[in-house]
Amino acid sequence: MRKENQLGYLLLLLVLIPMLITGCKKKEGDVEKTVITVKGSDTMVNLSQKWAEEYMKLHPEVSIQVTGGGSGTGVAALLNKTTEIANSSRELKPAELEDAKSKGITPVTYQVALDGIAVIVHPKSQVDNLTIKQVSDIFSGKITNWKAVGGADMPITLYGRENSSGTYEFFKEHVLGKIDGKQVDYSPATQVLQGTSALGEAVARDVKGIGYGGVGYFAERNDVKILHIKKDENSPAFSPAENNKVNYELIWNGDYSISRYLYCFTNGEATGKLKDFMDFIISPEGQNVVRTMEYIPLPMK
């Protein structure tokens, strides 16, 4: 009986061992994927995710992981070597360039798209257009009632982005501007929200509200109104979107003044699959993704 049991155990082992060995190996034909990490601008998250999806359809051997967190967060990750690509809706700051140099990082800049920053209000707002100066005075707290700019007699609720946001930085520098060489700051009454989507939702619920963000997030929405913006009192008013579509020409030719490039930064010149992905982004196929996502493609050369 003991011999029969021993024989049974032996046969069982002969069956199990090949199965265990097979389970520890990759199936024949499996290829280890190249992983590319992308981090940064919340303005660019949806666009970057779509780029990644379209590229991975063509290159299943590559896995691209996209996260947001803000332009500053993405740049910090690049400088700490925890991401291959930093998305940013602003250029690198001098302090960031110094930090990069001290860490042996050589940031390379890629212009990948353009974006208009829309100023949005509730659809029931009586205000349709503002000058840059009025927008600055509103967000700095000089103007606190809609009546001062042709609206109803009610207080203005300010909604803005967190200070790690490239949109926050750009809007502060180019819209709030400077007085006597000193940077104008946001009103302390500004309600800070994490991400453009959350800001849009807040304004959509608040008839007294005003906010700002990438036009691609708002162009197709009917629960917020995009204001027309004038450079000054004597200038025509332009909107970055009409009939739920982004107006490329107004941004390309500078008529809509609150606009900017969107950037990707890498550590040194991209090589291998990383270069191939960056080439895809600025290719006609990649720029078509920009259009479909309601951002502004690079001007045709």
Task: Report the location of each language-model feature.
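N-terminal targeting leaders
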Residues: 15-16
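C-terminal motif of bacterial Sec signal peptides marking the signal peptidase cleavage site
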Residues: 19-23
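Bacterial N-terminal signal peptides that target proteins for export
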Residues: 2-11
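Exported/periplasmic ABC-transporter solute-binding proteins
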Residues: 24-301
